[in-house]
Amino acid sequence: MKKRSLHFLYFICFLVFSVVSCNSENKEETILSKTENSGDEDATHSIEIDTIDPDFEFMPPSPIQIASILKKANMSYEEGLTNKISNADIYSTKFKQTINFGVYACDLAYCVTNDKYEEAGKYLKVAKKMSANIGLESIFQSDHLVERFEKNIGNQDSIMDILFHVQMMTDDYIHDNDLRDLSVIYFAGAWVEGMNIGTHTILGNDDHKISVLLSEQMTIARSITKGLGAVKNQTDDLVDLTDHIEEVVDAYNNLWSVKQEGENIDYLDVELKHEEVVTISEMILELREEITM
């Protein structure tokens, strides 16, 4: 079995841009600036993974791509969209703990980027709690991250610095400790939660915005399914997750509006009908319920 390079995007970086609601130009510039400055480091980090397909190479989206998507979506904070913290106690399997670590990390970023620091502190603590179950506890124990976070509540620049520090530590720790499969699974959890938040926020308000969001995210979904399919230990839960995401992608590709675009489709220009938006959105919400319950 050959090893192929898995160029895995720093997970917090993805989370920030997959759910962030950029409510002001200054906030957008701050986050984009931090991401651009870390670009050189991204290029030097890669994670290898044992793959079933020797020609497979998983390339997640760049931070700029994700930021562009969210600028168009302009999602605002809504109460009750994040995963309940109490749910952390019901996740007993390694798979559930790993994928919901991604969900909670996504919720953390959603709260931080919307200045909901009290809620963010709670999600940081639950992420730390769950990290102990999946082999990432040392990341949250180092540098007194929780204490630093609490001391800097209200200062988004400092909070963002802490999150970017976590992202780099996570990437290095996974690489150094051979925890590669974890990254693909919690990346999938973060993606599902980001889509859940985006769908809830936009659905019924602006079909054009959600059309663009869904269309661009389908490209990411295809990469995720390839990443999940490349994991060597194909458990039933993992296969079910992969199949479910593939069902969403297939349903999207079979929409009338998508088929009308033909082979040279430009996903940015796809305008879905309202009933098509509802169809895909309901599948995403069902998928999110499946992984969090």
Please provide the spans of the model-predicted regions.
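N-terminal Sec/ER secretory leader and immediately downstream segment
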Residues: L32-E147
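Alpha-helical rod/repeat scaffolding segments in eukaryotic adaptors/tethers
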Residues: N87-K94, Y110-A120, L124, L145, ...
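Extended amphipathic alpha-helical interaction segments
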Residues: G154-L238
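A cross-kingdom marker for long, charged
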Residues: G227-M293
